[in-house]
Amino acid sequence: MQFKNVALAASVAALSATASAEGYTPGEPWSTLTPTGSISCGAAEYTTTFGIAVQAITSSKAKRDVISQIGDGQVQATSAAATDSQVQASSTATPTSSEKISSSASKTSSTNATSSSCATPSLKDSSCKNSGTLELTLKDGVLTDAKGRIGSIVANRQFQFDGPPPQAGAIYAAGWSITEDGYLALGDSDVFYQCLSGNFYNLYDQNVAEQCSAIHLEAVSLVDC
């Protein structure tokens, strides 16, 4: 098994939410904040703790560094040390153009992930964990970090952890899965975007700016080193 120099971390704020045109409303149920559709053979449950690593989407499938956590719950990528618990990922590779994207997001299916025709997700890579590593579990399509916070897409399309419940205005708080290839997926898409902001990257579920590049978020096993 190949070890990757990847570290993942996450953090969040706290509020509650419901699905509406404006996103989640505090005090309402949030587990139904899911995208339309699901990816083929995506597993909505993976109870063994895992991390996630940024993988650039290029013709050569080049690997990048893994994600780390800072204090406010945003998922980010950076080459600097994380200090505030937002989720971050360090990266030394030059972001690729969005025109070069090769995505499996269009491969949707209503097939249940537990069907005999679907393989159980296999995590191909491992990473050493440390005090700043983002540790995740997945249950019933809900992504949770080690502090019990909920992985969500908030109003500005950014990926971060909050609550529970998720913060007001959150768009999605469930519908996560792991594909047969070992990638994190949300609804019917396994493509995310890292967008440069100063010396780090914030992570989003959509391409929100020119400085964004398409990525996969690879689920990796975490080990003590």
From Swiss-Prot:
Residues 1-21 form the signal peptide. InterPro entries: PIR1-like_C (IPR054508), Yeast_CWMannoprotein_PIR (IPR051153), Yeast_PIR_rpt (IPR000420). Residues 78-128 are annotated as: Disordered. Covalently linked to beta-1,3-glucan of the inner cell wall layer via an alkali-sensitive ester linkage between the gamma-carboxyl group of glutamic acid, arising from Gln-74 within the PIR1/2/3 repeat, and hydroxyl groups of glucoses of beta-1,3-glucan chains. Extensively O-mannosylated. One of its GO terms (cellular component) is extracellular region. PROSITE patterns: PIR_REPEAT_1, PIR_REPEAT_2. Keywords: Cell wall, Cell wall biogenesis/degradation, Cleavage on pair of basic residues, Glycoprotein, Repeat, Secreted, Signal. Residues 93-122 have a biased composition (Low complexity). Pfam families: PIR, PIR1-like_C. PIR1/2/ repeats lie at residues 65-82. Residues 78-92 have a biased composition (Polar residues). The record marks 64-65 as: Cleavage. One of its GO terms (biological process) is fungal-type cell wall organization. The PIR1/2/3 repeat is required for the covalent linkage to the cell wall. Belongs to the PIR protein family. This is Cell wall mannoprotein CIS3. It comes from Saccharomyces cerevisiae (strain YJM789). The gene is CIS3.
